[in-house]
Amino acid sequence: VLLVQSCIPLRIAPTIKDYKVTKGKRFKKGLPKKNVFVFEDPKDADEFYNYINTKFQLNGYYVDVQVPFLIEDKTYYFSFYEVEIPTKTINLVPLMLDVALAKATDMEPVFEDAHTSRKGNWYIVIEVFNDTEKDCLSEASVSQQLVLSYLRDLKKEYLATDNYDEIVFKN
C-alpha cells in the first residue's frame, strides 16, 4: 500500500529558538502595540499562569495583569498572554479524492474533515512597564537590559521547573 500525502501550508507558526523581542501587535493581532518578550511554551495550557501565581504568591488575584517585581529596588510590572498561533495546511490528497468521488458517484465529500489540518503552537508573550516608562522593552528604555536579563531568568526557571511550590521555598 502506497500512501502519498501532499500539503500546502497556508500559515506557518514562527519558530523561536530562545526568545524574541518584537512589537506585540506585529506578533499577533490583538496584542498590545508595545514591545513584548516572546518565547515558545512547550508546557500545557495554564502552566505559566500557575507558575506565576505560585512564584509571586498571588492567590489567583491579578495573575496575568500588572504582576509586580523588583530589579535593583525598583518596582516593575508585567502582564502576560498565552497565545496560540496554529500552522494551517491544505491536504491535497483527501481533497482530490472527494472531487473524484463526487464526479463519479454524486456523493457528498467523505474526507471533508481532512481537507485542512491545524497544529497549534503556544507562546508566552510578556510586556513590562513601570511608573516612569510605559514600555521597558523598548530600545529607548533605560531599563531594557535589566528587564531582559530578568525575563530570561524567569523563562529559564519556568521551563526548568515542574513543581512550582519548590520556587516559593527557593526564593
Language-model segments: residues:
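Extracytoplasmic electrostatic interaction patches
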Residues: 84-171
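Short beta-strand-to-loop capping motifs
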Residues: 37-42, 127-130
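Glycine-rich, compositionally biased intrinsically disordered regions
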Residues: 17, 47-53, 160-169
